[in-house]
Regions:
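Accessory terminal helices/loops
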Residues: 15-27, 204, 208-272
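Active-site metal-binding motif and surrounding structural segment of the metallo-beta-lactamase
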Residues: 66-70, 79-123
Length: 272
């Protein structure tokens, strides 16, 4: 079974044809770049030093239709977001029509304050709005419960809350015209060997959420993780494997701790 799964991942990787190194890349600054993934879409990649993790890249999405653009996730900070917006305005003559974050973390909406100062409309899951308000963060303007459909001209943007995973409020964005799925941080790149930071997530619900994503977006060709290289549907399968790995690890830790609690005092003393 494991060999079949590995083969499936390899096949999907080849079929997706997503080799990040072969894509047009625009380096805006040392901490910000754009990667063209379709005629109408770019991934913006920003870098920040995160305590305990080092210098980390984070992915966001830009959908373009004629002279308008929609932003999904900001770079890490207001200052990086300002650089991105100014570049889009200055080099592509684009108007930012709206913004929606994947969830409440700074790698998704760290630049929301700047966008609000610019008068740019913002949308988010109601769960994200509630958390942002509680944590005294900038609060997106308009919320939705289960789903939201927006339009950028004739291009349709579909947003869904399908359950907790990396965070309790994470959503997925689907762009049918481009066959682009942006599940953000709930999905891991193939280079990821673990789930990373899940302190604000739900490991129990994680697999079910990813399975709902797989079932709902069977025609997705481009899948954008929150961090690391872009891929295809194989990223969803890879993430489920990482969740299972984490759950086994958690189970072993729980079992070990439980054994210590029931261990005779004399034996416990000998162990330490």
């Amino acid at each position: 079974m494991k060999k079949i799964l590995i083969l499936l991942i390899l096949v999907l990787t080849c079929l997706s044809g997503i080799c990040q190194t072969n894509r047009e890349t625009i380096k805006i600054s040392k901490d910000l770049e754009l990667i063209k993934i379709s005629e109408n879409a770019f991934v913006h990649v920003s870098y920040s030093v995160v305590p305990g993790y080092g210098r980390i890249s984070a992915n966001g999405l830009i959908l373009i239709n004629k002279s308008n653009a929609f932003l999904f996730d900001t770079p890490w900070t207001d200052s990086l977001t300002m650089v991105l917006v100014n570049y889009l305005r200055g080099h592509f003559n684009l108007k930012i029509a709206g913004f929606i974050p994947n969830h409440w973390h700074s790698d998704c909406m760290g630049g929301l304050g700047y966008l609000q100062n610019q008068g740019i409309k913002s949308y988010a899951s109601q769960k994200t709005i509630d958390i942002a308000r509680k944590k005294k963060l900038p609060v997106p303007s308009k919320g939705f419960r289960d789903s939201l459909q927006l339009n950028l001209g004739e291009k349709v943007i579909k947003c869904y809350y399908l359950g907790a995973a990396h965070s309790l409020d994470n959503i997925v964005v689907w762009i049918p015209s481009e066959k682009i799925l942006f599940p953000g941080c709930m999905v891991k790149s193939l280079n990821s060997s673990d789930l990373g930071n899940i302190a604000d997530g739900d490991i129990i619900s994680y697999t079910g959420t990813i399975e709902r994503v797989i079932k709902k977006f069977k025609t997705a060709e481009i899948v954008i993780p929150g961090h690391g290289q872009i891929g295809g549907p194989e990223l969803l399968i890879h993430t489920i494997e990482l969740v299972r790995k984490q759950m086994i690890k958690n189970s072993l830790i729980t079992t070990f701790h439980g054994s210590l609690l029931t261990c005779p005092v004399g034996l416990f003393s000998a162990l330490i």
